[in-house]
Amino acid sequence: MFSHSFENDDHLNELRERLCRDSRDSLQLLRNFQDNPICSVVLDEANRCITVLWKQYATKAQFRYIHENLLTLICKHRVCKILGDDTALPTVPSEDRVWIIDKWFPRAVECGLRFAASKRPASYFGKIAVGHIQSAAPVGIECRSFEQLYEAKEWLDTVAAG
């Protein structure tokens, strides 16, 4: 099972330092990972699921800080499902998409993430970005996108936690 290495701790510390010098939104993210101007995160331990509601665009540092903390939750609580409300996500820059695909997904799968479902973004570029990420998901994780959040949740409720 994956455990956070010193390298990952160094990466998180570097991201924290960057965010400290960043915007007010970044400072609020540092103060409250679960509810801030960029996203809200809810852990449902009983169903081994994390729900992420994106509220606005995330800078590279914000995006990676959020995902590193999601990874910590996935590993610590043996989360196997993630539900995303991507409605307000305007886009994900290509550099961050590649990072998710090449760096984050493999670690999340190693920790036990098996299913990801999301409500499609409202913006055209958000839809393209999320579609690219989901289509490049590695073996071991099944990703689906839906027009409505309740459809994504219903699908996650049908898959085995295994």
Regions found by a protein language model. Give the residues of each.
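Amphipathic, Lys/Arg-enriched alpha-helical "gate/interface" segment within cytosolic domains
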Residues: F2-G162
